[in-house]
Amino acid sequence: MSKEQGNLPKLAAPAQRALTSAGIMQLEQLTKLTEAELLQLHGMGRNAVGTLREALKSRGLSFRTGMENRKMDKTIRTQLDNIRSEDAQLQNKAYMSLMKETEKSVDWAYEAWDELIEGLTHKDNHVRAICGQLLGNLGKSDPKGRMFKDFDKLLAVTKDEKFVTARHTLQNIWKVGLGGKKSQELVVKGLEKRFKECIKEKNCTLIRYDISVCLRNLYDATTSSEIKEKALELIELEKDVKYKNKYATVWKK
């Protein structure tokens, strides 16, 4: 059993890790989720949900029923509009704010989803990068599994003509895996594909290093042995000993 975190009750370690990965530190945050959405988190079981339900009840709170109006507030709406602003300062402010907001689960993900997907092919590479990173963050707010349909579109941005855009998207894409076991498998499969195919690309060694870091981050968040095994397997594909050793350092920390 883990120690209490914030005002959360004691839970088994897998359930506690699930909450931590989703950025949930306080009971009040659970009022934005339905029980079904909570169960989507990898490591969360019905016993833990029952414990959390009782803890909420003791404070006069409850999980979201799924029937409430889920429309985003005006501030979020304005920020989403501003990521397409031609004013770089306004655009960056919106980006920073939305990235911070989506560190935790949010209930407006599906209201923003389609416009973020459209943003992946926007003429402004900054918009493409922002939308790519936000979609990565929204992986934990996707109980309906929309990402399974759209993941290839997100992965495509990791090959963007602007390498800085591609890299920012790649470095954040592992967070899609925080949506549950199937989401983890989706991410690992996509990263494996990129690791192998980037051999023909100019920045192959940087891409492979970033992929190694992504897999380590996902492993740290989930402690899934399959992720570590796949990462080490991919590192063995590198022919250059210098870079093979560099990728391996990610797993020695």
Which residues are covered by each model-predicted region?
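Compact, charge-rich alpha-helical regulatory domains located at protein termini
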Residues: M1-R70
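N-terminal "cap/leader" segments of large eukaryotic alpha-helical scaffolds
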Residues: K71-K93
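Eukaryotic acidic, Ser/Thr-rich intrinsically disordered low-complexity regions
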Residues: K71-T75, C204, Y209-V213, N217-K253
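Short sequence/structural elements of tandem HEAT/ARM alpha-solenoid repeats
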Residues: D73-K74, D107-E115, G145-D152, K182-L191, ...
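Short inter-helical turns and helix N-cap capping residues of alpha-solenoid HEAT/ARM repeat scaffolds
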Residues: E86-A88, K123-N125, E161-F163, I199-C204, ...
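Conserved hydrophobic register position within alpha-solenoid helical repeats
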Residues: A94-S97, C131-L134, T169, V187, ...
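Structural signature of alpha-helical solenoid repeat scaffolds
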Residues: M99-K100, G136-G139, W174-K175, S212, ...
